[in-house]
Structures are given as C-alpha cells and as structure tokens.
C-alpha cells in the first residue's frame, strides 16, 4: 500500500466512524471530536478512546482504557496486528466496556 491508498482508506474509516456514532441507537452518551486526524471519543464517566492514524506504518492505532491496539488493512478490513480481530469488533467491545452499557457501532 502506498501513502495515497492509506490516506483514502484511513479517511474512509474516520468518516464511517463519525457516521456510525451519529447513527448509534445506544443510550450511551459518546462525544466525538476529530482534530488533525485524531479522533477522541469521550464517555460520560470521563474515560476516552483515541483513534489515530500512523502514516509511516500505514496503521490505525486505537487507545482504550484496557490497552492499545494497532490495525493493519488486510483482506478488505482493518485488523488487529496481534489478534487479527477486526477493528469494529474491538471498538464495539471497548465502547461497551467504557460506557458500561452495550454499544454497537454499525461499521
């Protein structure tokens, strides 16, 4: 993957995340702020999830209260570089844990 392809994929992911948060039917109050390619999700309890792009590595990084994850684009999906779990699954689990109620983002 070259830098241009990475930018297209990363931009598409960030846009999809914003749309999924807007459409989320959960009772969780999740605020989303994007600044300089970094998306911060803030929860009522003060916890945060940070999603950012690592251009030199062509990765998406996700920082949660439980830990950090690095995602590579493989076979049409962003997948955790360690476990192979798709980003939407990791993000839904992290949002649910931090919100204290089930959260499902339709990505």
From Swiss-Prot:
GO cellular component, as recorded: cytosol
Pfam family name, one: Frataxin_Cyay
A single GO molecular function term of this UniProt record: ferric iron binding
SMART domains with a match to the protein in the record: Frataxin_Cyay
Protein keywords: Iron, Metal-binding
Gene3D superfamilies: Frataxin/CyaY
InterPro entries in the record: CyaY, Frataxin/CyaY, Frataxin/CyaY_sf, Frataxin_CS
GO terms, biological process: iron-sulfur cluster assembly
Transmembrane segments: none
Highest taxon above the source species: Bacteria
PANTHER family: FRATAXIN, FRATAXIN, MITOCHONDRIAL
Stated family: Belongs to the frataxin family.
Function: Involved in iron-sulfur (Fe-S) cluster assembly. May act as a regulator of Fe-S biogenesis.
NCBIfam families noted in UniProt: FeS_CyaY
Name this protein carries in UniProt: Iron-sulfur cluster assembly protein CyaY
Organism: Edwardsiella ictaluri (strain 93-146)
Encoding gene per record: cyaY
